[in-house]
Amino acid sequence: MTFTAALLTLAASAAAEKPRLDMVAFFTGHTRTESVLKVALHKPVPLIVDSVGGKGDKGDFVMIDTVHEGNKPVRTRKWIMRPVGPNHIRGTLTDATSPVDVVVSGDSATITYVMQGGLKVEQHLQLQPDGRTLSNHVVAKKFGLKFARVDGTVRKLD
């Protein structure tokens, strides 16, 4: 094998290996989510979420979000999550009326839950090549119709 062929093989192998998303490792410590919230029939508003996550006293993962949504008063919400199988996490969120379900697949995760008023939320997170940023896309539906959408990024700060 020539040197050039070896380099091309190595480059192809490295490109084929996607980074794996470890939700607990990513969200342990401080993260900041910067997004735009688009609700049907309303103007888009900035949605900024500052989060602190870590191990809870019962061995679970706990994350506290400070949510800045447009001109609304700042609010907090709390996630409590536990692994329930390989690449599968389940728990609670103060905004949710159903359990929160997280399925991780390679470099991405899908989070689903139901909010007050019957809004069904589906969130997709995709790890970016830098390993410290996630793309964040959320759709909230009611009666099968898209009611709201969030698009932005999550950055690991420490």
Predicted regions and their residues:
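Edge beta-strand at a domain terminus
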Residues: 125-133, 137-158
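Short coil/turn motifs at beta-sheet boundaries
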Residues: 24, 44-46, 118, 131, ...
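Central antiparallel beta-sheet cores of small beta-barrel/beta-sandwich binding domains
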Residues: 34-116, 120-126
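A short, Trp-centered hydrophobic/proline-enriched beta-strand micro-motif
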Residues: 27-35, 135-136
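N-terminal helix-cap/turn-to-beta initiation motif at the start of protein domains
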Residues: 17-30, 80, 129
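Bacterial N-terminal signal peptides that target proteins for export
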Residues: 1-3
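Extended interaction-bearing regions that mediate binding to partners or small molecules
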Residues: 21, 30, 37-40, 55, ...
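Hydrophobic h-region of N-terminal signal peptides that target proteins for export
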Residues: 5-15
